[in-house]
Amino acid sequence: MLTSFAVILLGYYSVPPSLLPDSRIVRLEWENLDVVILHFRQYGYFENYIRKIVVEGVSYKIYNSTHLVSDRGDYLKYLATGKVSVAERLLYGVTFIIYGREEPLDGHIIFWGKILLEHDSPPKTVTVSLERAVLFFPSVHLPFEVNVEYIQNLSLGEHPHIFYSKEEVPALRSMICNEKSNPMNVSFPKIFSYLKEMADSFLTESYFSVYSGAMYIYLPPNQPRRHPDNFPYWTGISRELQARLETLSLIYLITGEKRYAERAKSFMLYISTWNQWTDPDYKCAGPRTCLDIGHISMGMAIAYDWIYDSLDAAEKFIIREALISKGIIPAYTEALEENSWLQNPMIWPNGYAIVISGLGMASLTLLGEDPRAETWLNTAINYIVRWMDKMGADGGYTEGHTYASYATDFTSRFLYALLKYRGVNLFNHPYMKNIPYFVIYSAAPDGKSIVNFEDSSLDAIYSWKETMAMAASLNNNRYAQWFLNLTGVYNRIIRSHTYNGIYHFIGFNPNIEPLNPEGSLPTSRLFASIGWAIFRTGWKSTDVLFAFKCGPWGSHHHLDAADFILNYQGVWFAAAPGYRLSTSTEAHNTLLIDGKGQVSGDCQLTGFFNSSFIDYVCGDASRAYPIEGLSFVRQVIFIKPNLFLIFDEVKASKSISISWIMHSETGSSIDISGSKCTIKRNERTMIVNVASPQRFSSSRGSTEDLPYIRFNIEPSNNIIFLASLNPTSKKEEESSISSLFYGDYTQIDFTSLEGSGLAVISKKIGYMLTLQNISSDASIFGLIRGKKNEIKYFILNGSLLLGEGTSTVIRFSKRGFGAVKISVSEVSCEIHLNETNDVSIYSPRKPLSVYEVGGAEIPYKYDDAQKTVTVTLKPGYHVITIKL
């Protein structure tokens, strides 16, 4: 018993806490205020009980949960975080407790007031002594020498200035208090009530957890505990903290109620004492930065700006210094470092956007307070422009919609704050102007899901908020406003990515009239920057969406070059696994070759054309497979409104086998009968017919919960496989397909809703083929005999198409793409050219007029002998109408 007591006593005496070198006293001379910062690390197994802290002979002890009292009767605010807590013990009363070896390893005691005594010359160091109590024995004094730092003046910035100036706050309050009708049917008073309820819950919660309880954070938040596994716990933690900081501070800004500012302040002071704002146990892209630092920096910056008037001088100093040393400096340093991941946005696009936008917002907040802020801000601006330059000028985003919305919405906040405070408008960058179309074209017909290629979820459709709102309010993109109306994300609080509840009131204008893209936008669009093509029949709930991808390899990609998905009236008959399932080729709608999937590799789209009755895309996925000399080209012809022809040609220097796979959404039923497959779901049907000159077998299975059909084609060194997809809701919408395979071409006869037709896929470009009285030298050509005495011709990558009776339908001086409709009263032609071209179009007689879409007449030459109108057209997309 005595031995045990002696060991305990020895432990208490022999292992005092260690005071780390950054401990100091900061003298804020203009305020005549001193801030004592004591940073502890405890190495022993035993608790240390600190009853008093003595500075220059003056003792300070705990008065209550917020203040110390000196033996001179002065009251000083204090903070105890991390390894240090305050509790009452029977023998010691209310005391600081510095815990033993268990985590966290670090802790702080910070207090401020008039502390340093008058000196003839300012001291460089001061002795700080801790009075440690040990049972009934006399107290032990632990002396430490700490440096004294003198700050002559702390520049005071103008606050608030992030999103709202002081003069704009009354208008914000008025907007929230007054119910006004608007085209979006958004009620700001109702939304504010939801947000205030959230803030009220933040006032009283004692903890939150992340990743289904994998880690708990008790509030106010100490630095999270260390963890042995390489998992990004801090990403979830930082997002949750950002949500609380922004929500509490916004409610304070609007209501002026101090309790919200006090709660936000307590979080900020605790976070300010963390050793760093990026997880030390997660191996991220860089040693100093990850998603967490971006989230914490932005949340701390916005809260600092909005509750600024509730902070005393010491609190401003503590938070500002942390924002600089733990948020700005690590991101700024890593951005400028040679070979850093922040030198190249494509290494990790979403991570780059989060870190740089966090740096930008923090720098913007400190303008006027630190002379370095201009340099930091300019760096953030230059780097975010570099990021936008690397994203698609056409609006395409490489990592899929979950990360596209995450990165771009986060960036939009920084850009909007920059615009509001500095007048720098980066929303006119091509990426920011065009990404709304990437979103709009990707939305499922029923508006309840979105294209989920790469690491993306179907419900990412509800994650798009700020980018779309700011596109509408700043660039007058009424289609973006329509999308927000479709998803309804501004009619309620959706914490997508967990942190963005406050942005209903920032950059969103409910008075802009939405514009439905139906009938206004082309129904299909190419996003060449990422290798995506999206075909649609429109934006009604009864429409079809087909998406195809074959592009460069990148972050968060799947091994699925030449993949496709199809949504018919809300049903994903051809489905992607998204973020929840495998990234392997087997889980996607593409080919296995010799039973094996793809490896990472840059692939490309090699052809695209869209028109009113036929769309086309071609992708070369050869480089995705580790087989020397392999060629895999997939071509898709969309015969509107509901027939898709998918034509695969695989060549190799040796005999190979392939497996053609297509998955459907969970709950789909699949029936296979020979070469025909019927998929049913929610009273909708898709019929799949397949054909090949090689023999093949069929099977069914599932990748986790996604059922699939699989066709295994016998080995050959030149394999052709044709699949037709025909989604329907009625028997009369079913198409019929027959195909013939020849050495140089494939002939496909079909019937569809629009009539009967022919498609020819040629292996010999530039070689004239004649079938069923039409001839062409194109890669693909054909016709549809419409039910309304209308003939429709198409030529894809060719120079000449001769129609029935050998008359010229269309001739290009250089190869092009065209779709021609011939009726009694007019000939219309949709054309895509890669270079300037003289184009001759069939006209049975001299036209009354020739004009391009929009009504502008264009000059032409009419050849009565050839019955053609010739026009000269520049590269690009053209719609020509010949009035007869």
Annotated model-derived regions:
Residues 161-163, 169, 176, 183-189, ...:
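Aromatic-lined, polymer-binding surfaces characteristic
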Residues 54-55, 61, 65-83, 89, ...:
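CBM-like, beta-strand-rich accessory domains located in the C-terminal region of large
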Residues 1-14:
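Secretory targeting signatures
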Residues 56-65, 121-146:
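Extracellular polysaccharide-targeting segments
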Residues 339-340, 366, 403-574, 714-721, ...:
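Carbohydrate-active enzyme catalytic cores, enriched for enzymes
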Residues 13-40:
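Extracellular carbohydrate-recognition regions
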Residues 140-228:
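Low-complexity, Ser/Thr/Pro/Gly-enriched N-terminal "stalk/linker" regions
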Residues 32-43, 53, 91-127, 131-134:
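Extracellular beta-strand ligand-recognition surfaces/modules
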